Amino acid sequence: IKGLVDKTDATSTEASASEMGASPYTSQVISDMSKQSINAALAQQITDLEKEVGQAEEGEAKLELLQQLANKWDDIAKPIPQGYIYEEMAQQNPTVTYWLKAGDAYRKGYTNLQDTALASALTTKAIHAYESAIELDPSNLSAKTGLGASLVVGGGNPMTGISLLQEVVKEDPKNLEANRALGLFSLQSQQFDKAVERFITVVEQKPDAESYFYLATGYEKIGLRNEAISAYQKSKELAADPTLSQYIDRQIAELSKSN
């Protein structure tokens, strides 16, 4: 739940396609940055695998090595380098699956990231990945959802993103990711009643601490205190974050005083 209590908007920097070309965040730079926070033995395993990838010829064997590398990063919850790997795989073998995996990894990577420059670069890369997936499959709802969410966050054209997300929920009213993204936008734009509707749909399908937190925030903002307290309590039950729990306790105490 990192970033829920800290209100810093780490992904507000607008990105453009030209920035991606000039980005200092190469695959190697990202890999080196990511290795700094893991143990030396695991970092060496990844380095060795990267050398194998570099020596491999284009084709199935190289794709298999890249998949092994992506899996290594996934095992330790490092989506940013994983995104770069899936993008390389998509460039070698352009499929909707690879482009979607790249976009999803980039989007997961930029969410709540406090490095605004890197977040901007990742948002741009996510947009490119989802657009590439849509070129291959124009009706793909996952790609439309990812693109819409990325445009809302930092693509410089949030209303286009909103239109895409609304298109998704029109076709698939219960779509989890589209409802979540629309709910977050509703909170940011202070449309709290709409946010509540979206997050009710989300928690019905996937009751997690983050979604209940946002639902509680929406309830609180429209004056439904009892509902807000209940949703905050649900969030606390599902969270494994002492900082968030302390924040929720304070919110519940304030709401209880008001009753």
Model-based region annotation:
Residues 1-80:
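N-terminal leader/linker segments that initiate helical-solenoid repeat arrays
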Residues 68, 101, 105, 146, ...:
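Canonical tetratricopeptide repeat
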Residues 71, 91, 104, 149, ...:
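Residue-level recognition of tetratricopeptide repeat
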Residues 21-29, 44-48, 59-68, 94-113, ...:
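Amphipathic alpha-helical repeat scaffolds of TPR domains
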Residues 74, 107, 152-153, 187, ...:
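Position-specific recognition of the canonical hydrophobic site in helix A of tetratricopeptide repeat
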Residues 63, 96-100, 141-142, 176-177, ...:
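Helix-start (N-cap) detector for alpha-helical repeat units in TPR-like alpha-solenoids
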Residues 43-46, 77-84, 113-129, 154-167, ...:
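Structural signature of tandem alpha-helical TPR/SEL1-like repeats
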Residues 60, 93-94, 138, 173, ...:
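Short coil turns that delineate tetratricopeptide repeat
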